[in-house]
């Protein structure tokens, strides 16, 4: 069991809003269980960036847009994820607007994106996104 708080920052639904552990949040997705919705997949992908899990990032990228290789920014320190909106756009499509904060070489930056997702055979995939 991994009692570490999940990097995605999701909290429990109870009034105290306690941080969920990796095992209770993104861990099942990383272990191969399908994400229940696009927001959960987005959160699990963020956690994969934090953990440096390139195989997971690539496996959850839709085959129509997936790069052959992916190199993560060396020395990046991920600082947090904010989900601004999760919108269902069709029976098997959704969008997630998020802000991911990180620091590289002492410089803080943020990625504000509207990402598109598609569900195929019961699994959600990241397709692409627009930087906002």
Residue spans of the language-model regions?
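Cysteine-rich micro-motifs
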Residues: 20-29
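Conserved hydrophobic/aromatic beta-strand scaffold that supports enzyme active sites
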Residues: 5, 95, 114-116
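Core segments of small alpha/beta cavity-forming domains
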Residues: 29-74
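Short Cys/His-rich zinc-binding micro-motifs
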Residues: 2-19
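Generic structural detector for well-ordered beta-strands
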Residues: 7, 82, 116-118
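A short beta-strand motif that forms part of the nucleic acid-binding face
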Residues: 29, 100, 130-132
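Surface-exposed, charged secondary-structure patches
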Residues: 73-110
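Short beta-strand edge/turn micro-motifs at domain boundaries
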Residues: 112-132
